[in-house]
Amino acid sequence: MSARVARAGWAWRSWGRRAASSLREPPPDAVDVAELLRDSSVAEEGAQEAVARRRPPSQCSVLLFPGQGCQAVGMGSGLLHLPRVRQLYEAAHRVLGYDLLELCLRGPQEDLDRTVHCQPAVFVASLAAVEKLHHLQPAVIDNCVAAAGFSVGEFAALVFAGAMDFSEGLYAVKARAEAMQEASEAVPSGMLSVLGQRQSNFSFACLEAQEHCKSLGIENPVCQVSNYLFPDCRVISGHLEALQFLRRNSAKYHFRRTKMLPVSGGFHTCLMEPAVDPLMKVLGSINIKKPLVAVHSNVSGQKYTHPQHIRKLLGQQVVSPVKWEQTMHSIYERKKGMEFPSTYEVGPGQQLGSILKCCNRQAWKSYSHVDVMQNIMDPDP
């Protein structure tokens, strides 16, 4: 359906301060800091979807929102000419209780890289990039038919699609980040990016890594695929000893390249189980609506269908693999000869574009990145 949906004429309103220390309840007067404008005829979904089906794919757009790991000092600096971007960061300051913009602009990088900081930072920067895109190419927002976000990026995608208000979405991200930071500090764990090949057996490698950990006296060791990126490329999360074992034995498992990721824990595994309840309590206390644009879940790769579906899967996402490769197939799979929509990665980094190229080269040919570093340029007259 069209983003009558999500015209990024985001409506800004003021709201009062709240105690930043409590995660039990949402801001008492948190109004729609970034409510996406809704058309009065939005209830006529069947008619809207029929219109979307008639629109040529080349006139449609897809927005992709990045996740943790793409943060860099200076992000957001190219967007501050836009008044609404400054309002985003001012609102974020109130929700978070600290100056997120200052941290993003000046760092230091090691503070920005902490899970508790980088998840809100990427969330806000990505929605700021949507503002830039709307400023430069408003038709892209109006013609958006689908959105997806990688891990924490899924929250930004849902805010863009009108399923959550900005303030409450950020409040949920804050709770998620703090709970995941605490869980990651309980067990020495991490994430390993693995580029394999056709004969690579990721599951078998993980099982042998678990057995190695047991031989070291580690009880209930964790080692499993946590991100499906593109064919033959996975991220494996778990105990550090398991990941080190895989690196030492990469030739045995036909791994072409391995790299430890700069994250604080074994995300998207059962090691994050302690983070689920705090997040679910917050998700249960905020207003979640049916998305006005199709948003695809990391857990299933399929579209969300209703608010309870969103709550359930956002909680599961913390301890489940990110099925990004499957999501890309779900969005872009089509008959031979059919056109592809334009794709925009909104936020820091271009990792999702690189992954799209490996999943579907034809779809990637219509890919663009909305940078959050460079100074904004007005559209050509």
Curated annotation (Swiss-Prot):
EC numbers: 2.3.1.39
Chief place of localization: mitochondrion
GO MF terms, alphabetically ordered: [acyl-carrier-protein] S-malonyltransferase activity
Pfam family, one: Acyl_transf_1
Residue ranges crossing the lipid bilayer per the database entry: none
Alphabetized SMART domains for the sequence: PKS_AT
Consequence of gene loss (knockout): Conditional deletion in retinal ganglion cells leads to disruption of retinal ganglion cell axons.
EC category name: transferase
Expressed in which tissues: Expressed in retinal ganglion cells.
Subcellular location: Mitochondrion
Functional pathway: Lipid metabolism; fatty acid biosynthesis
UniProt keywords, alphabetically: Fatty acid biosynthesis, Fatty acid metabolism, Lipid biosynthesis, Lipid metabolism, Mitochondrion, Transferase, Transit peptide
N6-succinyllysine: modified positions: 312
Reactions listed under catalytic activity: holo-[ACP] + malonyl-CoA = malonyl-[ACP] + CoA
Active site: 151, 268
UniProt keyword annotation of Lipid metabolism present: yes
Coiled coil segments of this chain: none
One cellular-component annotation, GO: mitochondrion
GO biological process annotation, one example: fatty acid biosynthetic process
Primary role: Catalyzes the transfer of a malonyl moiety from malonyl-CoA to the free thiol group of the phosphopantetheine arm of the mitochondrial ACP protein (NDUFAB1). This suggests the existence of the biosynthesis of fatty acids in mitochondria.
Similarity remark: Belongs to the type II malonyltransferase family.
The name this protein goes by in its record: Malonyl-CoA-acyl carrier protein transacylase, mitochondrial
